[in-house]
Amino acid sequence: MINDLISDGLTRIRNASMRRLDTTKLLHSNVVEATLKILANKSYIESYNVVEEGNKKFINVVLKYDERGRSVINELKRVSKPGRRVYQGRDEIKRFKNGYGTIIVSTSKGVLSNDEAHKAGVGGEVLCTVW
């Protein structure tokens, strides 16, 4: 049984992009789906769709590569973990990697990117960073 579906999903995406695979399959959870929605909106992945196989849900993720065949994701890192939670207040959420990166935050208003959380004036648990 996998305890941390977010870490598992990020690791599967990272491994698939290193192997230059077109798609990868993740276990479904609402937080993972919200994280993928942000990654798709920020153009880190092409797309994703939820599929149901039997009584289990999975998410198929289509990865994105540049014209040279390199992954557009340089680094995908889990920040807050089950054993060590990391929280940032609304004043601590700032630009990441000079605006080229994204911080994904779980807030009281849902899972948001650092830009959205800053505009909404909320802080929360830092799930991961992407650039």
UniProtKB/Swiss-Prot annotation:
SUPFAM superfamilies: Ribosomal protein S8. Belongs to the universal ribosomal protein uS8 family. One of the primary rRNA binding proteins, it binds directly to 16S rRNA central domain where it helps coordinate assembly of the platform of the 30S subunit. This is Small ribosomal subunit protein uS8. GO terms for biological process: translation. The gene is rpsH. The keyword RNA-binding applies. One of its GO terms (molecular function) is structural constituent of ribosome. Keywords: Ribonucleoprotein, Ribosomal protein, RNA-binding, rRNA-binding. The keyword Lipid biosynthesis does not apply. Pfam families: Ribosomal_S8.
